[in-house]
């Protein structure tokens, strides 16, 4: 896993087109304060080939998670938001601009730090 800083977020989300039409693969609770979210998404740096991206949220402050069986039903046509607000990293389904709008998402995570890993589709 590579650390992702708040200054890299814009480039990172642009690279994956804000996860539009991505597929949520899994949500893994590693510990009460660490949660890993895995998505299949298209990578603009690889001619839009599909890859797997895992996001590991550490120091989780708040979250709304779904059962594994529900992940395939999440509408990702508008993508997801990955933002840095109030000194926290936040991920939420759809277009969100701050933590309070993220909390309206069907799935969201708010944490102190973020790491990522790329893998095969």
Q: For each predicted feature, which ranges?
A:
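Surface-exposed, interaction-prone regions used to assemble/regulate multi-protein complexes
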Residues: 1-121
């Amino acid at each position: 896993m590579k650390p992702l800083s708040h200054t890299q977020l814009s480039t990172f989300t642009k690279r994956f087109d804000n996860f539009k039409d991505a597929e949520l693969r899994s949500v893994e609770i590693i510990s009460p304060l660490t949660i890993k979210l895995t998505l299949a998404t298209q990578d603009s740096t690889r001619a839009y080939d599909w890859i797997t991206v895992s996001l590991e949220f550490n120091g989780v402050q708040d979250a709304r998670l779904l059962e594994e069986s529900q992940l395939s039903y999440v509408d990702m046509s508008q993508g997801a938001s990955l933002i840095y607000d109030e000194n926290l990293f936040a991920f939420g389904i759809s277009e969100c601009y701050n933590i309070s709008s993220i909390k309206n998402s069907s799935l969201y995570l708010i944490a102190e730090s973020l790491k990522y890993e790329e893998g095969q589709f």
